[in-house]
C-alpha cells in the first residue's frame, strides 16, 4: 500500500501548473529555497554528488541542486507536478532525472545508491512519516547525508503556519496543512535514530513579516530542518 494521502496528492496536483510562478501559491517555497539550498550545500558539498530529492514536486529544489553540479534524481507521486518539473527542466536546460515512484519502492530497488537524500516540506503530508525516514536511510550510501524539513507541532506553529500563513497573510492556500500531522523535532530525531541515522544538525527557519524574508535561526518552534548522516 502506498504511503500517500490521495487528498494531499490531489491538492498539489491541482496547483501543479502554478509551481514555478514565484508570486503564486508556491511563493513560500521559492523564498525558502535559497536558504535550504545553501544549508544543504554547506553540509554535503553538492558538486559532483548523486542526490535524490524525495517529494520533489515541480522541481524547485531539484533544479537548484543540479545547478550546483549535483547529479539529481527527483521522485514524486503527483503525475501533474512531475510533468511541470520535466517541462521546466527542458526550458531551463538544467538536467534532472524525474520518476513517479514511492520512496519505499525506490529504496527496495536502489538501496545505498545516493550520496545525499533530501526530503523537504513533505513528511507532514504523508500518513506514515517514519516509513519515509526509513526509506531515506536505505537509499543513502554509508557516510552520506539525509536532510529533512517539516513543521513543529505546538500552539505557536498552529498559529503561525496554519492560522497566520493560510488565513491571515494568505501566503498559502487554505487547507495546505493538517496540524495533526506536524512533527516535533524530538519525534523526527527519534524516527531517524530508529533507522541508525545520526542527527548532525538542526536549524529553525523564521519568517519576518516586516521584511517578508526567511532566515536561519536557533528557533525551531515552527519551521525547522534536520541534517542526518548514515554512519559508514
Swiss-Prot record:
Alphabetical list of CDD domains matching this protein: AdoMet_MTases
Residues bound to S-adenosyl-L-methionine: 36, 55, 76, 120
Keyword Methyltransferase: yes
EC number: 2.1.1.222, 2.1.1.64
S-adenosyl-L-methionine among keywords: yes
Signal peptide stretch: none
Keywords attached to this entry: Methyltransferase, S-adenosyl-L-methionine, Transferase, Ubiquinone biosynthesis
A biological-process GO annotation: methylation
Enzyme class per UniProt: transferase
GO function terms (MF aspect): 2-polyprenyl-6-hydroxyphenol methylase activity; 3-demethylubiquinol 3-O-methyltransferase activity; polyprenyldihydroxybenzoate methyltransferase activity
InterPro entries: SAM-dependent_MTases_sf, UbiG_MeTrfase
Known pathway: Cofactor biosynthesis; ubiquinone biosynthesis
Domain of life where this protein originates: Bacteria
Pfam families found in the cross-reference section: Methyltransf_23
Catalytic reaction annotation: a 3-demethylubiquinol + S-adenosyl-L-methionine = a ubiquinol + S-adenosyl-L-homocysteine + H(+); a 3-(all-trans-polyprenyl)benzene-1,2-diol + S-adenosyl-L-methionine = a 2-methoxy-6-(all-trans-polyprenyl)phenol + S-adenosyl-L-homocysteine + H(+)
Sequence similarity: Belongs to the methyltransferase superfamily. UbiG/COQ3 family.
Protein task: O-methyltransferase that catalyzes the 2 O-methylation steps in the ubiquinone biosynthetic pathway.
Full protein name: Ubiquinone biosynthesis O-methyltransferase
Gene that encodes the chain: ubiG
Amino acid at each position: 500500500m502506498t504511503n500517500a494521502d490521495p487528498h494531499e496528492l490531489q491538492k498539489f496536483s491541482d496547483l501543479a501548473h502554478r509551481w514555478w510562478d514565484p508570486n503564486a501559491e508556491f511563493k513560500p517555497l521559492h523564498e525558502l529555497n535559497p536558504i535550504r539550498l545553501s544549508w544543504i550545500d554547506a553540509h554535503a558539498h553538492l558538486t559532483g554528488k548523486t542526490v535524490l530529492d524525495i517529494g520533489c514536486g515541480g522541481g524547485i529544489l531539484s533544479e537548484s541542486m543540479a545547478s550546483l553540479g549535483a547529479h539529481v534524481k527527483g521522485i514524486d507521486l503527483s503525475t501533474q507536478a512531475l510533468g511541470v518539473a520535466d517541462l521546466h527542466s527542458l526550458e531551463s536546460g538544467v538536467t534532472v532525472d524525474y520518476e513517479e515512484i514511492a520512496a519505499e519502492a525506490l529504496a527496495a530497488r536502489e538501496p545505498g545508491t545516493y550520496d545525499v537524500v533530501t526530503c523537504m516540506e513533505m513528511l507532514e503530508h504523508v500518513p506514515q512519516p517514519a516509513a519515509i525516514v526509513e526509506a531515506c536511510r536505505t537509499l543513502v550510501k554509508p557516510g552520506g547525508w539525509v536532510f529533512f524539513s517539516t513543521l513543529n507541532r505546538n500552539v505557536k506553529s498552529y498559529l503561525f503556519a496554519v492560522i497566520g500563513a493560510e488565513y491571515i497573510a494568505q501566503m498559502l492556500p487554505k487547507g495546505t496543512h493538517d496540524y495533526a500531522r506536524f512533527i516535533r523535532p524530538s519525534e523526527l530525531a527519534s524516527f531517524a535514530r530508529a533507522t541508525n541515522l545520526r542527527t548532525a544538525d538542526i536549524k529553525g527557519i523564521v519568517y519576518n513579516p516586516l521584511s517578508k524574508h526567511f532566515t536561519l535561526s536557533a528557533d525551531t518552534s515552527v519551521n525547522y530542518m534536520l541534517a542526518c548522516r548514515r554512519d559508514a
